[in-house]
């Protein structure tokens, strides 16, 4: 018995017919050649079937890269933001521009190396090159799995300098953060609420911009913000789901949001007017305003780096730091249990309160 490894009726029917045809060809081959191959009884039946299957593969059985992209987006793209489809499609376009749209078994290591060299020549940073290779490898591997192909991925294991062009983000000094928070309180509008909210929680911008008002819990013994997945805003990793106690400027911002007269269910309605949270729009607007107050090279994301430094400076244990920031620690033990309670997290956050 062989599993067709798909829930899609169309693909199941196609693969069932294909498997049936391959078996029929195999038995026909045995009937015709058995008398001519004295050592056949000693051969591995598994190897024979595999070899016969590969010999009988036709172009019709193997998808091209465009078809591989389509099935990848159809199944893996469900519930993902538009940026996911856009990034995968962009990478596909790059590969086609360099090597053309071919059947998967026709792509070579040479194609992969030319793709790498083209990305580098284009001026992409090491992290961007890594991201493009991640997408093309995922598209290729998913199609190989779905179509049960015996193919190696020519885009796997290609070397490139991951540090090329990467600018290390500098943390923002604590005194500058305090000045920034005071300016936010002075202006007191929704853009400044978002900056203040991020400043004392270490949240990612997309996490903050996609919040519901109901994610801000102010009536508990310890006020906190709940970071959870929403249809309009995904989370980066499983570790990103967490509760962060609210202190200082972040608590102030949460109170302003809850007490605002806006009837929207979103904490930041202006960035949630479409199907997905417009984190890029928020980034552009907030970084432009912050530029006058922070050192050169610092951005809104620097607040996240700063929170890690602030916690480190008070000798906060690394696993607590990781839980507050939603960082993946890489240690096995952190995947067990429910993590630290709000009282423990709050104790350490209170130590870095700038007020």
Name each model-derived stretch.
Residues 3-82, 93:
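N-terminal helical hairpins
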Residues 94, 102-110, 121-156, 204-206:
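N-terminal DNA-binding recognition helix of tyrosine site-specific recombinases/integrases
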Residues 126, 130, 156-211, 240, ...:
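Basic, Lys/Arg- and aromatic-enriched nucleic-acid-binding interface segment
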Residues 141-151, 198-222, 318-320:
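Short, charged phosphate-coordinating catalytic segments
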Residues 210-253:
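Conserved tyrosine-mediated DNA breakage-rejoining catalytic core shared by Y-recombinases
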Residues 216-222, 296-297, 316-337:
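Short, polar N-cap/turn motifs at the start of nucleic acid-interacting alpha helices
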Residues 231, 251, 274, 325-355:
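Catalytic-site neighborhood detector that most strongly recognizes the C-terminal catalytic loop/helix
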Residues 247-296:
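Active-site/catalytic core of tyrosine-dependent DNA strand-transfer enzymes
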């Amino acid at each position: 018995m062989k599993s067709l490894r798909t829930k899609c009726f169309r693909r199941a029917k196609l693969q069932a017919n294909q498997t049936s045809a391959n078996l029929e060809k195999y038995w026909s081959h045995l009937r015709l050649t058995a008398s001519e191959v004295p050592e056949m009884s000693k051969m591995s039946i598994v190897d024979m079937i595999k070899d016969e299957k590969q010999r009988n593969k036709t172009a019709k059985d193997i998808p091209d890269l465009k078809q591989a992209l389509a099935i990848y987006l159809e199944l893996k793209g469900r519930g993902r933001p538009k940026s996911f489809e856009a990034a995968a499609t962009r990478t596909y376009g790059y590969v086609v521009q360099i090597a053309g749209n071919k059947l998967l078994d026709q792509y070579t290591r040479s194609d992969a190396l030319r793709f790498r060299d083209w990305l580098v020549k284009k001026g992409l940073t090491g992290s961007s090159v890594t991201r493009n290779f991640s997408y093309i490898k995922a598209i290729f591997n998913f199609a190989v799995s779905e179509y049960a192909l015996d193919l190696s991925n020519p885009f796997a294991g290609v070397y490139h300098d991951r540090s090329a062009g990467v600018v290390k983000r500098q943390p923002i000094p604590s005194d500058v953060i305090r000045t920034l928070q005071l300016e936010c309180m002075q202006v007191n509008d929704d853009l400044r609420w978002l900056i203040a909210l991020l400043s004392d929680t270490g949240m990612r911008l997309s996490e903050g911009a996609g919040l519901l008002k109901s994610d801000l819990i102010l009536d508990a013994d310890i006020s906190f913000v709940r970071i959870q997945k929403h249809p309009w805003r995904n989370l980066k990793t499983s570790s990103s789901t967490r509760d962060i106690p609210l202190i200082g400027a972040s608590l102030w911002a949460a109170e302003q949001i809850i007490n605002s007269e806006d009837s929207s269910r979103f904490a930041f309605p202006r960035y949630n007017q479409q199907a997905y949270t417009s984190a890029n729009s928020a980034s552009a607007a907030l970084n432009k305003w912050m530029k006058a107050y922070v050192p050169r090279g610092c951005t809104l994301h620097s607040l996240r780096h700063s929170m890690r430094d602030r916690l480190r400076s008070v000798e906060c244990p690394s696993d607590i730091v990781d839980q507050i920031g939603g960082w993946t620690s890489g240690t096995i033990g952190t995947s067990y249990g429910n993590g630290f309670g709000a009282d423990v997290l709050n104790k350490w956050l209170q130590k870095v309160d700038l007020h």
